[in-house]
Amino acid sequence: MINAMTTSALDSGEIKLYIKDIMRPVLGIEDLYKAIKAIIDCKENKRGLYNLASFNKTAEQIAYEVSEVVGAPVVEYEADPTQIGNTKAQTKTYNFSISTTKFKRAFSFKFKETVESITKSIFDNYKDIIKTNRGKIFDYEWL
């Protein structure tokens, strides 16, 4: 979501916001790396299923925080539920939020990434990011 909003801002000059009330968990790449390292470095057997997320926020909160970093306006569009293929997303209140309490307690872990830190990373590295058309097949073998 942050990737798409930042890319939209840099490519079109605006952040498009359709279903603003959907709650989303977001995991920053630095937090992912540190969480995996915490698991690998742990000397105890703490096998289990864990949720990982740097934070949970609504699409609206994320959009306006991305806007602060990139300086592009948020343009709110009214989503047409008949044009949304994912039936779960047809409601304005679908909630994807997750709890990371179990992981934080088990590994004494603190998630640190924010919308701002993730957006700045994308913004600062934008020219080096390989952009693809999601509608076309892309051959990554040459990388």
Predicted segments with their positions:
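Amphipathic terminal alpha-helices
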Residues: 114-143
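Conserved C-terminal active-site "lid" loop/helix of NAD(P)H-dependent oxidoreductases
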Residues: 29, 60, 82-110, 130-132, ...
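Residues that recognize and position ribonucleotide moieties
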Residues: 25, 55, 96-97
